Amino acid sequence: MNGKRIKVLVVDDSLLFREVIARGIETDPSIEVVARAADPFDARDKILQFEPDVMTCDVEMPKMNGIEFIRRLLPQHPLPVIVISTVSEAVFDAMNAGAVDFVTKPEVQSSKSVEKFLLDIISKIKIAANAKISRSNTADTVNSSAGKINTNKIIAIGASTGGTEAIYKLLKALPAEMPGILIVQHIPPVFSNMFAQRLNNQTLLNVKEARTGDWLESGKVLIAPGDRHMKIKKIGDRIRIETFEGEKVNGHCPSVDVLFESVAREAGSSAIGIMLTGMGYDGARGLLAMRRRGARTIGQDEQSSIVYGMPKVAFDIGAVEKQTSLENIPQVLLAMLK
């Protein structure tokens, strides 16, 4: 934001929450709350009047819910939106509508819960201020009869901000006959299981949240739990999954680096690594380790990334063999599997 304060519009039908959010985020000197709104219609007027850089928006509101509001708003007023929600699958609908990120609503009675919420939303506002607004162009579903696929590989994917929607678009474009896929998405606990169930229902692949003792098999996708690292262990010709609690790595648990480094070590040239949109540098070092051990590697390009952070660092250090748009990644991946 070039040293200027980030202008934020806070939208929530609860006066109490509007005040908690507005006062809390303004404790950060780089953020200025330019307006508050009680409903989407009020918010639309405030957007025109104040031209905010970022909007925070409750999912559950009267007159029009936050998801419908985002769906209608963004084509006319492209604006980074962070949705605030109780623990519910609605956050993924909001991301699909074009929101950049989400934060879980705190218990107002718990000062610890509110404090954690404010730290989280301040961090996400700063990321959102530099984010690109996604247009909902999805990758085309790939014809599953488009040639023989080598399923004796392992695919490892890492993502952060903007990643839930990017992963959905990527997996939706893949046929059922695929090698086993491992995913680390920076996501809170509980939501990781919801995310896995949603992908399982919306794609041709068998998707679940990973558990220690799971075996990676073709057609199966395992997503790291929101508060546990994930790594693999090769036992004979099979791949066993381990998830475990641990210190944050690069500020994250689960960490993409933890997965990628174990894949480099255990699978070597039998793997393909994919780095998708996200803030920071988690996974760059691990992707480089994979490439050095003979793995093929793909990075999402700047144009199609909501936040070109993790893929940029990976590209800059030489970890990315092929950089391309999100829409083109399925084709590149399938070509590598021929």
What annotation goes with each model-predicted range?
Residues 2-9, 15-30, 36, 41-56, ...:
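Conserved acid/base catalytic micro-environments in cytosolic active-site loops
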